[in-house]
Amino acid sequence: DPEDYMARSAVKWLIRLGVNVLTMSPGKKDYGHHNYPLECIEKAMAWLKLHGNEKIGIAGASTTGTLALTAASIFSDISLTIAMTPSDFVWQGFMQGKKDGCKEWPIEGESLFSYKGKPLPYMPFRYQHPDYWRIISEESKRTGNMVASRKLFDDSEAAHPITEEEFIKVENIRGKLFLVGAEDDALWDTAKYIRRMEKRLAEKPHSCEVEAVVYEHGTHFVFPDGMLKTMLPVGSALFVKLAFSAAKKYPRECKTARIDIDRRMTRVICDWRDKK
């Protein structure tokens, strides 16, 4: 949802750095991603240019971190890409809501994203409805996390090794690429995915300048500390502790990671903003 509280809070943090921000969403109150048309990004870029924005950057976290990478790999006008806890491949589309007692389910034959009317090649999930949600629910209870889908992703990749066409072509990204994640991410193995992207870039010609950082402890919420405080002025650290078990065990390390992310991301954005 473009009016989502977390999205609006992220916008406030970014605006303080002197950049204009436009939020993107599949639809109002829609937290699923299935065949999301990348033409929406194209239209947004055109609108921003029409209104005097000469530079285009894109940022996302979690699934939208993967969206940011995918869009930047296709649209060469994007000169800054920030991906927090992303995957390096496109996966099967999913919906959220209520269905047969499940809060989320994959959609057969649909990708996370589409372009020119066609779904992008994607990794199918090992578990389909209703087993998909059962696995997530069981793992969340077992690990003490708000959401734990790492087993879902690990088992899916084991059953269906990711093909070249399913990997995001990060070597096509222009300008600055900033990747951030944590080893203890409960949703998916973003640390592995980030290292895989670094390896891909080392092996392929590319023009982007990449900065990748992976923290031992940071959870799925690898947000800049100031951004999280904007979202939750009181109790931001407590909220992360309640959401993810790693934050309960390593609160100081998670806090230190968020402060470092804030410093790094602020520098990256300001350098890009000021570059002639």
Predicted regions and their residues:
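Catalytic nucleophile-loop/oxyanion-hole region of alpha/beta-hydrolase
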Residues: 24-57
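C-terminal catalytic histidine-bearing segment of alpha/beta-hydrolase fold enzymes
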Residues: 195, 206-276
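Acidic catalytic loop of the alpha/beta-hydrolase fold
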Residues: 184-188, 219-222
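Accessory cap/linker subdomain of secreted extracellular hydrolases
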Residues: 82-170
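Short alpha-helix in the alpha/beta-hydrolase fold that links the catalytic acid
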Residues: 175, 189-203, 227-228
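Short amphipathic alpha-helix adjacent to the substrate-entry channel of hydrolases
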Residues: 5-24
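Short glycine-enriched nucleophile-adjacent loop
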Residues: 65-76, 81
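Short beta-strand/loop motif that positions the catalytic acidic residue
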Residues: 173, 179-181, 185
